[in-house]
Every structure is written in C-alpha cells, then in structure tokens.
C-alpha cells in the first residue's frame, strides 16, 4: 500500500478517466491471433519487432489467483496461474482472440513441399534472372537461408534493381496464370519481395527499396492477381493467395484501385459469414488483406493531412463493405470477431472518406446494435481515438459514462459491509447467500493471518484500500469485458489491484474451475492483507521484490491462508493437495528451488510448493515462520535473506520438507476444502450487546476492553478489543502456540452457549510482549454478529480525507487539505492537524514545512456537529534537497541563494514563473570545466525582468547578465569550474512572466543506461525531457528498455543517434498495453527519429538492434 505508488502511475488512477485507463485496450482485440498465425507474419509491414513482453506486467500490483479450467490444463500450462501484473494496468492487458482456433495443420495444403533443399544467396546470386524466378516459383520461402537477414549476399541480391524487378515481373505473370489448385509460387515471390522491403527499411545500402515510388512497381502484379478469376475465397491455394497479397501490400504499397479490387472478396466473406468466419484459413486471408492495406495507408499518412492522400474519397466501395461487415448483426461466438474487424477498420479507413459524419454514425449504430458487447466497446473507443471523441451531432461523446454504464450493466448489484469499508459489486446471477459467505470468509482468513503476522495496524492509511471493493461478474464470459471496462487483464481466475483497493473475479461452475468462488476469494483476500498489514511499499517495488525474494511467499502463503478456519487454525485444501499428489516425486521442488521461484518458472507449480513451505513452517517450524514474517514486516531484507539462505542450504530441512510434501500428498483423498459454515447465515435472534461483550471478556480473560459496532447491509457486527495477560512467559514461540490454542478453546466454549451468534465469532491476537513481572501479554480481538441494533448509533460518523504529497523537501512549504472530508448527516465543525513532528494546526487546509529529514505521520482529525470524530493518517517522507537529480521546474520558495533550486544540467529545460508577489527565482548549476557558458531564457508575458549570474562565495558581484533578444533573455560569459547561481528577478510586482531556462557549456556528463534493462520491468528511467541518454547494444545485448512520463499532452520528439554502424531502431508503447505500438523510429542516415503527440501517462521506449552491434545516444525532447 505502499508509498502512494511513488506517483509512478498509480497516482493517475485516482485522477485519470476510465477511458485513459483502458486506452486502446480493445482496438485490436481480435488481431493478436492473426499476427502470429504464420511464421512469415513475424515480419510485419514496416518491420517492427514483436513486443509481446510479459515483463510489462511489473508496473502495478495485480494479485492473480490461478485460473484452472481443469486439473490437467492447470498442470500442463502456466497460463492457468496468471502472474501478478504491476499495471496498472500494471496492468498488461492480454489481447482477446476470436473464437477461431489456430492449428498448424490448418495451414494451406500448398505449404507442403517435398523439396526441402536449402539455398543461400551465394547460389541465388549466380543464377540468371530466368533461372532464379523459375526456382523461386517452385520452392518455399523458408528454403532460402537468411532471407530476412542483412548480409553481403542479401545486399548483393537485393541491391540489383533489375533482379528485384524480374521477381516482380514473375509475380505478375504468376498472378495472371495461377489456378485454384496451383499458386504458381505467389507465396514465395511475395515473401522474397517482403524480405527485400524489410531489409531496405533498415539498411541504407538498400534504401531504394524503402522508396514508395519503387514499391509502387508491385501494384501491376497485385492487380494481375486480383483480375485473375480465381481471386476469391475457395480452395486452400486461393485462400493463401489472398493472404500473401495482404502481406505484400503491408510491406509494399497500394492504391485506390488495388483497394477497391478487394471488395468482391470481402463481400463473398460477408455473404458466407456463418460458414467462413469459423474457418481459420479464410479468416486469416481476409484479415491479412484488410490489415495490410491499413498498415500501408496509415504509414503513408502519418503526420500528414489525410485529405492529401491520393486515395482520399476514392475507396468508398471498400469502406461500405467494411461497414456492412461491421453492422452485420445477428452475431455468434464464431462470427463476432469478423464484425469486430469490420468496425475497427471501418473507423480506420473512414478517415479517408469524404463523409466523416456517416462513418461516425455507423460507429454509433454499432454501439447501440451490440450494446455492451465487445464490438460496442471497440466502436466507442474508435470514436474517441480516431475522431477526437466527437459524435455525429458535433458534440463530445461521453466515453467515461459509457464505461460506467457498462459496468453497471454487468455489475448491477451493490452490497456494503462494515460501515462501507467492504463493498461488493456483483452480477445479478451471483446469489446474495454467496455474497454473505464471502464476507464471513474474509473474517476467517483475517483472524488466522493476524495471528501469524502479529500485526493488524495498517502500514499506511489514506490509500485506496481503506475501502476494499470486490467486483464479481456473472461468468467467465462476462468477466472478459472487464478488460474493456477497467483496462485490466482477464486471462486469469481473478486479480487484486492494490492501488485501487479492488479485487476482480467471476462466478464459476465446477466445470469452469476446480476452485470455487470462495476459495479464490480467500486467496485474493490474503493478498489484500499482505499489502495492507505486512509488506511495506508498493508490490513489485523495492528490494523485497528483487530476485524473486517474495514471489513464493506472496503466492504460497495466499494458497496457505485460503485454508483458514474459525477454530481449527489453517488446514490444507484438497484442491492444492491434488497437485502435490499428482506430481512425480523426482519432479518435486526442493526447498531451495521453492524459496527462489518466480513467475518465470514454466510450470508455475511454485504456488503449490510455496503453500507446502508455509504449511511445513506452520506445523513444524513456527519460530522460523514468525521470524520470517517479522523480517518482512520490519522491511529487514538482510534478516529475511539470511533466513532464506539458511533454509536453502540446510539439507536436513530439505529432507523434512520433502517428507512433509509426501505427508500432504497422502492426505489428498481424505482432505476437504475449508469453507464458511452455514451457522453464519442463520437468524441468531436478539441478545443484548452488553451481555455479549461481558461474556466474551470473561471467557477470554480480557481487560481494558473497547468495542466498535459496524453496520452492514444484511446484519451488523462488532469488534471487541482487549488485553490478555497470561502466565509466566515460556518464550515467544511457545507463548504463541499456547495462546492460539487458548483462543480456539474460548471460541469453542462460547459456541456452546444457547445464543447461536457466538458461532460467528472469529478471534486473533497481536502485539506480543512480556510484562515487567515476566507475564505474557497480547492484544486480543473478537469479531462477530451483533443483533442488538440499539448499539448502532443513529449519528453517522464523519469521514476524514487527507490530500497531500507523499514526499517533500526539508524547509519547503507543503500543502495539505482536508477539503474532501465529509459528514453525511450533518457538518464538520473542526479540522485538527498533527504533522508528526510536534507541530499542529487547525483549519480545512494547512501549510507546513519540516525542519529535518525523516518519515512523518500526518494525521487529520475531523469532528462533526454531534461530536463524532474520525481520523485519517498518511506517511510523508521528507528528504534533504536533492542536489543530484536535474530539475525541470522551479519549486517555491527559491527567492535567494539559500533557497536556490537545482541542479540545472545541460540539455534539460527548467520552467518557472514570476507572478504577483513572487518577484525572484534562484537556481544553481555546476560548471565542470573552464569555458564559455550560455544562458537562454525565452519567455512570455512582460519583458520587465532580467537575470544575473554569481559565482559561489561571492554573492555581491555578478559575473553575467541577460539581454533581451527575440523574446529571450540571453547571455554568454567566460566561466571557471565550480558552482554558480542564476538570479532571475522582475522590476515591478505588476508584471507576470513565464520562462524556460536553458544553460549550455556546463560540460555535464551524459546519463547512461543501466543494465540489465532488457525488459520493461527493468527499464532505465529517463528522468527529464531533453536529457541525453547514452546506450549500447553489444554482443548478446539486443534490446534496451527506457521509460518516461508525460505530465501534459503535447508533441514529443524521440531521437536516436547511432555512434557506430549497426542496425538499430526503436518502438514506443503505452504503459497500459505493451502490445499497443504507438509509433516507431524513422531511419535517416545515422538518426532514427519520429515525432508523436502523447497524452499524460507513462510510456516505454524499446530500443533494439537487428544487425551488428554498437553505441547510441537517445533523447526524448519536448
């Protein structure tokens, strides 16, 4: 819960709209399957590396439970146990594939070729053009060694324009002569040409192949293929010809004639939709055809006015056919993907229509026609992204409202518990009884968790999980729409997102999952408890999450505590024991392997073996289990590592562990699954609250008791807290064991009482201590149903809500606000602040400056007009002023040298303002070596200001000043090595100025990438715009990931300068979906650059090489 998510991206969750969260999630929902159907598809139109990077899952904490369709599937595939995803969307959103299932055996029969001889470029270059084309015509493309690799041979082969033209001519001839059963080498011809265009894109020696004018030379061949009477869906050969044409268009080019010639194929497909849509090969053919055209057109139109494109207004027949496909209606599970394709590409190609309004109306019609179905989400998204969110009526469409309404459609019911701190939103087919059971299940898990962990105080308050929200869809099918609604992965049985304090899952039948809803909830609820009460900091962030330290623990103890009971401790579940029993003895994890497991383990059995470790420690080595939890609770990485190493290296412990696994496996047949008792659901009848509290306190020997009552939708509950003082301490671990048994005995004793409400009691103990007279002492907590409603006050307590930063600097004013606090049945009459350093304040809003670095708890107490109070606290970390990280904007106060902001480094722009009474800003910078320094300060507003530069140690004599030149205050001066200050001030208080400060000539070292950064979760952070990053791709290092954040919408220019001769490029991806490529680098000599308009959010920049090795410099400019 964790350090306010470091403002990395989870901050944006509370601020961004739903449409920002789910941006581009559904736009290509059906394409992923087709992009990888054929090996040759891996080279896309303009070659962009496939970035199906699972490491993007490490941006936000999503706690995922196993999704187990059946035991064999889970046993055989890790996809049934989905790893945590830290993205927010962290979350990676998996693409939703159409129902058409891909199988290699469904590839065209023409692919088979008994001639498996291989050919290299040295041989091919020795053939005449006629010999070459005859050979190509009769072999498969993958018989040519290194076809897509740049080499001396491929350079010579494709460097011969006449040879390439001969291949194009041969393709044209095959296009005229192919039959329904003989493609005349069309697939191989197109793949050879695609290889040439691929290599031409990245290599200057073949740059002519990247010229659209040359690529247009393929158009006659394309038209010849289309004019052939066999150009239609039919035999495997005919389908493959259409597929090859689509791929070639994507790598080469097309025009309006080529596009409109595709209409008969689309029409044939639509008119036979029920027959053709389930056919993988025909679906591939149509998809490749449409996709290839769109890829070519979008590349040609990039950053250009679409109205200037030669096909603008000339492809209406094609657009109309896409419209007919998209609005086909009467869809089935087998045909839905096709209409999805139609709507998506209708939007894309509609940009070239002269009737924009008709396109938008069609998209709006799709929203209504496929109400809250996948296609409706795609249509709404395309209006938002392709048409700037403007509807056919000229007004802004409310995408957020659409998503909210969709969520209400799928989750129409809301249930509240514990004064609104436990909320369940559910589908209409999820029974109320099950909802109640889930609430009581949480209490059983909570009681056993706190016993073991020894803490029930939230590590941080004021975060989203102060209110736990659970969203339960009716079925796995409806759950899939959560991708569209909330932008999270749904290829799982359920997941918990810590920064949202929300758990998502679905109701299921035994046929759909071996785990019941309650079992899965118990697992996920444990993740909530881990985050709130045990592991400090955001999941996936910090040293505890390096090197798979806690992966086994997170998942293993979640499986363990899912077996929590009311009075029998924690029991093993049959559903988990089944895996241990089925796994062969020689395949079982060792203790060392289990303790070092992670999501990269292919079989994902560490869930089950992690459970086995937790159960082993719980049953046979509780001292180690408690020490382990203490180390985590105290963020003591060193002690935790020592515990893990000791266990890993102890052969005897491993033997005991293996024996324990066998004991668990032997219990499989007789094991059960701990679920809540029917006793929780009974009508318990009235019993006076004071009697209940008294009887519990007496039975448990408690003193200093206090009680709070909680109101829920179906019943009310109470929480009773007190102090237990026992006999002489026998040591912490013996005391723990005896206390746990005593508490279970108390619960069982109370359950024998005539009032059945005692059967709803759960209890735990925390805060172990020993008194001065050596007596053991615990804080004990009981929770149960409350039938005396008189104990529930009619006055609703106010709700305190604090807003403020999670970090600050010593001496800097920090603003805190309680404006979001509220009182539902009255008004708040006072706000009392405690800043944790001895200072206090009163008022709705407050400003405070800390004098020392440290971590402080800021607490706001609000009091309503009836005297009820509420408090909220959060942690703020105060640091000494950072003198190493470059700044990009001023921070007040900075009126004099003592308060100067900095450092300023070369290449990083610093923005500031002088408004109203703020008449001066001061910054510092360091000069690395003697020489000329230039300061440029472009501005807007009044020119009635200037700047002065002072050398450190002499604040009386300035050494330079700025002069006005073209709306910029500029100056160049000779400087010596050392620290300097620039003092910017205005001449009168009436002037308002906004400025940008740039300094050149400092000799600052450029920032360097931090290896290993070959996956997105290890991305090197680009701290500021306009910063030069030095990187290298040498030897086996083939990729580097970078990340940066955009605070305000605007254009970003990404530039990569090659320092060596090698093949390198980059692609840009949004944090919300790594598979969504926003743009890519355009090669121009040694520079690979592009400009793109970006919205606020986090982005990942992937730099990768495709030939050779070398160094580069990278800048993200704004």
From Swiss-Prot:
**Record carries keyword Hydrolase:** yes
Q: Where is this site: C-terminus of form C1c?
A: 1018
- For region Degrades soluble FALGPA peptide (furylacryloyl-Leu-Gly-Pro-Ala) but not type I collagen, the annotated ranges are 396-1118
* GO cellular component assignments: extracellular region
**Which residues take part in binding Ca(2+) 3?**
890, 892, 918, 921
**Enzyme Commission number, as recorded:** 3.4.24.3
State the residue spans of region: Catalytic subdomain: 389-670
Q: Which residues form a coiled coil?
A: none
Quote the catalytic activity from the record.
Digestion of native collagen in the triple helical region at Xaa-|-Gly bonds. With synthetic peptides, a preference is shown for Gly at P3 and P1', Pro and Ala at P2 and P2', and hydroxyproline, Ala or Arg at P3'
Q: Where is the active site?
A: 524
Q: Where is the PKD domain?
A: 797-885
Q: Where does Ca(2+) 5 bind?
A: 1009, 1011, 1032, 1037, 1040
Q: Used how in biotechnology? A: Widely used for tissue dissociation due to their potent activity on connective tissue. A mix of ColG and ColH is used for isolation of pancreatic islet cells for subsequent transplantation.
Q: Where is this region: Helper subdomain?
A: 679-790
So what family is this one in?
Answer: Belongs to the peptidase M9B family. Collagenase subfamily.
UniProt remark on domains: The mature protein has 4 domains; a metalloprotease domain (S1, approximately residues 111-786), S2 (877-882, equivalent to PKD), and 2 collagen-binding domains (CBD) S3a (997-1003) and S3b (1008-1118). The S1 domain has collagen hydrolytic activity. The metalloprotease S1 domain is composed of 3 subdomains which together resemble a saddle; an activator domain (residues 119-388), the catalytic peptidase subdomain (398-670) and a helper subdomain (679-790) joined by a Gly-rich hinge (387-397). The S2 domain (799-880, PKD) is flexible within a larger structure (S1 plus S2, residues 119-880).
Q: Extra notes?
A: Clostridial collagenases enable the bacteria to infiltrate and colonize host tissue, and contribute to gas gangrene (myonecrosis) pathogenesis.
Name recorded for this polypeptide: Collagenase ColG
Provide the species name: Hathewaya histolytica
């Amino acid at each position: 819960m964790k350090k306010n998510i470091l403002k990395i991206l989870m901050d944006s969750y509370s601020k961004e709209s739903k449409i920002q969260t789910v941006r581009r999630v559904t736009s290509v929902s059906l394409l992923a399957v087709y992009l990888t159907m054929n090996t040759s598809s891996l080279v896309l139109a303009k070659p962009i590396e496939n970035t199906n990077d699972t490491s993007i899952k490490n941006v936000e904490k999503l706690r995922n439970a196993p999704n187990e369709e059946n035991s064999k599937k889970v046993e055989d595939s890790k996809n049934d146990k989905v790893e945590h995803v830290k993205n927010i969307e962290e979350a990676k959103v998996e693409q939703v594939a159409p129902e058409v299932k891909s199988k290699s055996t469904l590839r065209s029969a023409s692919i088979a070729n008994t001639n498996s001889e291989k050919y290299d470029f040295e041989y091919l270059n020795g053939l005449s053009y006629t010999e070459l084309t005859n050979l190509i015509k009769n072999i498969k493309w993958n018989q040519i060694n290194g076809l897509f690799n740049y080499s001396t041979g491929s350079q010579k082969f494709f460097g011969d324009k006449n040879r390439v033209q001969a291949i194009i001519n041969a393709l044209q001839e095959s296009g005229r002569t192919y039959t329904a059963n003989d493609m005349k080498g069309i697939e191989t011809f197109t793949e050879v040409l695609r290889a040439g265009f691929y290599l031409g894109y990245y290599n200057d020696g073949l740059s002519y192949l990247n010229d659209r004018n040359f690529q247009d030379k393929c158009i006659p061949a394309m038209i010849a293929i289309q004019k052939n009477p066999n150009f239609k869906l039919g035999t495997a050969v005919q389908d493959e010809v259409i597929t090859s044409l689509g791929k070639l268009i994507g790598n080469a080019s097309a025009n309006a004639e080529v596009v409109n010639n595709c209409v008969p194929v689309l029409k044939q497909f639509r008119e036979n939709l029920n027959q053709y849509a389930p056919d993988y090969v025909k679906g591939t053919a149509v998809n490749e055809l449409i996709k290839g055209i769109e890829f070519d057109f979008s590349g040609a139109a990039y950053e250009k006015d679409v109205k200037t494109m030669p096909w603008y207004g000339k492809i209406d027949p094609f657009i109309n056919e896409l419209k007919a496909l998209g609005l086909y209606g009467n869809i089935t599970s087998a045909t839905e993907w096709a209409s999805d394709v139609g709507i998506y590409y209708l939007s894309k190609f509609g940009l070239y229509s002269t009737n924009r309004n008709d396109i938008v109306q069609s998209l709006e019609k799709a929203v209504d026609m496929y109400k809250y179905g996948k296609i409706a989400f795609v249509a709404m998204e395309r209006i938002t992204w392709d048409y700037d969110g403007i509807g056919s009526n000229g007004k802004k469409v409310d995408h957020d409202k659409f998503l909210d309404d969709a969520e209400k459609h799928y989750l129409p019911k809301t249930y509240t518990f514990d004064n609104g701190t436990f909320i369940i939103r559910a589908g209409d087919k999820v029974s109320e009884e099950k909802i109640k059971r889930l609430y009581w299940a949480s209490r059983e898990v909570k009681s056993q968790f706190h016993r073991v962990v020894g803490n029930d105080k939230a590590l941080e308050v004021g975060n989203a999980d102060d209110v736990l929200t659970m969203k339960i869809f009716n079925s796995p099918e409806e759950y899939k729409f959560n991708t569209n609604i909330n932008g999270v992965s749904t290829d799982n049985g359920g997941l918990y997102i810590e920064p949202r304090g929300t758990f998502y899952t679905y109701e299921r039948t035994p046929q759909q999952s071996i785990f019941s809803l309650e079992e899965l909830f118990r697992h996920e609820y444990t993740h909530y408890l881990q985050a709130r009460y045990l592991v400090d900091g955001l999941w996936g962030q910090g040293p505890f999450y390096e090197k798979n330290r806690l992966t086994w623990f997170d998942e293993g103890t979640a499986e363990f505590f899912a077996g929590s009971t009311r009075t029998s401790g924690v029991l093993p579940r049959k559903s988990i024991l089944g895996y241990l029993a089925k796994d062969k003895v020689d395949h079982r994890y060792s203790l060392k392997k289990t303790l070092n497991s992670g999501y990269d383990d292919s079989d994902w059995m560490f869930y089950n073996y992690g459970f086995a470790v937790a159960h082993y420690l719980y049953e046979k080595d509780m001292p180690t289990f408690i020490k382990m939890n203490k180390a985590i609770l105290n963020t003591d990485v060193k002690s935790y590592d020592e515990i893990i190493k000791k266990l890993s290296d102890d052969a005897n412990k491993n033997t005991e562990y293996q024996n324990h696994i066998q004991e668990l496996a032997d219990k499989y047949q007789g094991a059960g699954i701990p679920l809540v008792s029917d006793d929780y659901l009974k009508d318990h009848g009235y019993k006076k609250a004071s009697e209940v509290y008294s009887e519990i306190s007496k039975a448990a020997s408690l003193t200093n008791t206090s009680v709070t009552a909680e109101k829920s939708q179906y019943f009310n509950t109470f929480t009773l807290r007190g102090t237990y003082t026992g006999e002489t301490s026998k040591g912490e671990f013996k005391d723990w064991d005896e206390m746990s048994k005593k508490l279970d005995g108390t619960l069982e004793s109370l359950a024998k009482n005539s009032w059945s409400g005692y059967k709803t009691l759960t209890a735990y103990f925390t805060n172990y201590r020993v008194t001065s007279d050596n007596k053991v002492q615990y804080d004990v907590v009981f929770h149960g149903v409350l039938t005396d409603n008189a104990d529930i006050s009619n006055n609703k307590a106010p709700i305190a809500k604090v807003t403020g930063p999670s970090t600050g600097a010593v001496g800097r004013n920090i603003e805190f606000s309680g404006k979001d606090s509220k009182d539902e049945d009255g008004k708040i009459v006072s706000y009392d602040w405690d800043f944790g350093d001895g200072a206090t304040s009163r008022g709705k809003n407050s400003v405070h400056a800390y004098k020392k670095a440290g971590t402080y708890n800021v607490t706001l107490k609000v009091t309503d007009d009836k005297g009820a109070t509420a408090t909220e606290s959060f942690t703020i970390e105060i640091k000494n002023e950072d003198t190493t990280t470059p700044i990009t904007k001023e921070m007040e106060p900075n009126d004099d040298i003592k308060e100067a902001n900095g450092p300023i480094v070369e290449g990083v722009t610093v923005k500031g303002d002088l408004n109203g009474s703020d008449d001066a800003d001061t910054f510092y910078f360091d000069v690395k070596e003697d020489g000329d320094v230039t300061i440029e300060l472009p501005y807007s507003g009044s020119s009635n200001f200037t700047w002065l530069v002072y050398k450190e140690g002499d604040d009386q004599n300035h050494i330079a000043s700025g002069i006005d030149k073209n709306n910029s205050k500029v100056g160049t001066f000779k400087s010596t090595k050392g620290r300097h200050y620039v003092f910017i001030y205005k001449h009168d208080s009436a002037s308002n100025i906004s400025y940008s400060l740039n300094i050149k000539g400092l000799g600052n070292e450029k920032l360097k990438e931090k290896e290993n950064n070959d996956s997105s979760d290890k991305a090197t952070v680009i701290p500021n715009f306009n910063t030069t990053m030095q990187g290298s791709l040498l030897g086996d290092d083939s990729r580097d990931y970078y990340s940066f954040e955009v605070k305000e919408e605007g254009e970003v220019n990404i530039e990569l300068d090659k320092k060596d001769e090698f093949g390198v490029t980059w692609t840009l991806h949004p944090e919300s979906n790594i598979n969504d490529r926003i743009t890519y680098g355009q090669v121009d000599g040694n520079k690979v650059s592009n400009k793109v308009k970006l919205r606020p959010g986090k982005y990942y920049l992937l730099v990768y090489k495709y030939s050779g090795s070398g160094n580069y410099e990278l800048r993200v400019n704004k």
